[in-house]
Amino acid sequence: MIPLQHGLILAAILFVLGLTGLLVRRNLLFMLISLEVMINAAALAFIVAGSYWGQPDGQVMYILAISLAAAEASIGLALLLQLYRRRHTLNIDTVSEMRG
């Protein structure tokens, strides 16, 4: 069995990588991918903590987090497709400019 500290350190590293990608990248698709990495890091922390204490709650939270991530990804990708069709770019700086 993997020790609790190793699993939580891995989850923290993944979360920080996702947060860095979310803050640094200006492309909305990469920001969505970084958000997915952050959700998976939190789900990994639930799994590790649940297996350490022998409780199934971590696995239940993992299923909830994965279903939430799937819904978020499908809605996000649909919005990105519509945005790309209208503006022909996914750069957040050009999208945030107002027309008028």
UniProtKB/Swiss-Prot annotation:
The chain crosses the membrane at residues 4-24, 28-48, 60-80. It comes from the Bacteria. GO terms for molecular function: NADH:ubiquinone reductase (non-electrogenic) activity; quinone binding. Gene3D superfamilies: 1.10.287.3510. Pfam families: Oxidored_q2 (PF00420). The keyword Repressor does not apply. One of its GO terms (cellular component) is NADH dehydrogenase complex. It is a multi-pass membrane protein. Its EC number is 7.1.1.-. NDH-1 is composed of 13 different subunits. Subunits NuoA, H, J, K, L, M, N constitute the membrane sector of the complex. NCBIfam families: PRK05715.1-1, PRK05715.1-2. NDH-1 shuttles electrons from NADH, via FMN and iron-sulfur (Fe-S) centers, to quinones in the respiratory chain. The immediate electron acceptor for the enzyme in this species is believed to be ubiquinone. Couples the redox reaction to proton translocation (for every two electrons transferred, four hydrogen ions are translocated across the cytoplasmic membrane), and thus conserves the redox energy in a proton gradient. This is NADH-quinone oxidoreductase subunit K. It comes from Serratia proteamaculans (strain 568).
